Amino acid sequence: MITKISLILFAVLLVSGLEEEERWKRSLQPGAPNVNNNDQPWQVSPHISRDDSGNTKTDINVQRHGENNDFEAGWSKVVRGPNKAKPTWHIGGTHRWRRSLQPGAPNINNKDQPWQVSPHISRDDNGNTRTNINVQRHGENNDFEAGWSKVVRGPNKAKPTWHIGGTHRWRRSLQPGAPNVNNKDQPWQVSPHISRDDSGNTRTNINVQRHGENNDFEAGWSKVVRGPNKAKPTWHIGGTHRWRRSLQPGAPNVNNKDQPWQVSPHISRDDSGNTNTDINLQRHGENHDFDAGWSKVVRGPNKAKPTWHVGGTYRWRRSVDIPHASTDNVDETFWEFDPHTEDDDDKPVLRLRRSDDEDEEEEEDQPWQLNPNIARGDDGNTRADVNIKRRGENHDFEAGWSKVVDGPDRAKPTWHVGGTFRW
């Protein structure tokens, strides 16, 4: 009976349009105020579908987004097919508020509600009813997050899981007037965290990060301190250094980036006891990108030969630059010359390009790009591949070729060619 009633409700809702959303104001009186500049804080989304296994599934979701409160609920059921079963559902929401209730309490980061709580309850396909609640606070120098979850009914009923963590941001230099770095007052931040998972393991971890103008740093430590998977800790240390290849004063910026080159060394220890070292080198230029990396397990049960990769990208227009070109024998209705002078050369260069209006409206100056790459993997195979792409206004094109040139899986190459036409 309940199933029949639900199907009737779906039929009524779907009259206005299948798989569409209906949004409305709960208050229909003229002049009802907007909430967060949204005219429709409430919305309902009915849906019905049939999958590859022959199951017909119906579901409906209701949402409301308000100034201080959010609400969400949903119901889903396979009404016909081999997987027909009891429905699943969920109900939850979020409430935001200030910890200080005094009038005139200051905003933090332009947020009126630094605190928020989100309770939730749901039933899954296995018949488990799960409840959980999360509390968050986002402040100027500190963030906090805690959560609790438990299967209160069903075959997987067990002890609850939980987590507590946060982030503290600060300057390494505590002197008054210490300069901002990249418009960030706190280049340093530390994030401690502790949690308990479904297997009964209690894990603690801490991460430290610094984001600077030319250097980034990151380090972390994690350990299961209690439970069946208690073991030695894991850790990682790494960073990034950015610099110009040209060290002369006044070297030009590339794509508004002062440091087109960057190197990122890293070392870590995983759960299996392997210590892995790797280093990556990248360059991002106007017409060229370059990427290379090297990685090796230097200690542990999986110690082996290193892996590596080298690749890049070249972007260009289909019509290339022609130095000292003339306009003789050129169809002016289809082609035009664009005078162009290089910064490091007084000789004029004429760029040949299509004179179509859409050429000037293209967001990218180089719709074509070529990506060669070669790499060696953990299995000892050295693979070479090359890809070519073009992104146009109405047409996209892509082609690629790949081959294992050395190693146990050496074989004939693979390739692909495809595209997209929009109209």
UniProtKB/Swiss-Prot annotation:
Cellular component terms per the entry's GO annotation: extracellular region
Keywords from the named record: Antibiotic, Antimicrobial, Cleavage on pair of basic residues, Immunity, Innate immunity, Secreted, Signal
Signal peptide: 1-17
Skewed-composition ranges (Basic and acidic residues): 376-385
Residue segments, region Disordered: 28-58, 108-128, 180-203, 355-385
Protein name: Acaloleptin A
Tissue specificity remark: Hemolymph (at protein level). Larval fat body.
Residue ranges, compositional bias (Polar residues): 34-43, 180-189
Protein purpose: Acaloleptins A1-A4 show antibacterial activity against Gram-negative bacteria but not against Gram-positive bacteria. Acaloleptin A5 shows antibacterial activity against Gram-positive bacteria but not against Gram-negative bacteria, and may also have antifungal activity.
GO BP annotations, alphabetical order: defense response to bacterium; innate immune response
Signals that turn on the gene: By bacterial infection. Expression detected 2 hours post-injection, with expression increasing until 48 hours post-injection and remaining considerably high at least until 72 hours post-injection.
Propeptide: 18-26
Top-level taxonomic group: Eukaryota
Acidic residues biased stretches: 357-366
Family under the similarity heading: Belongs to the coleoptericin family.
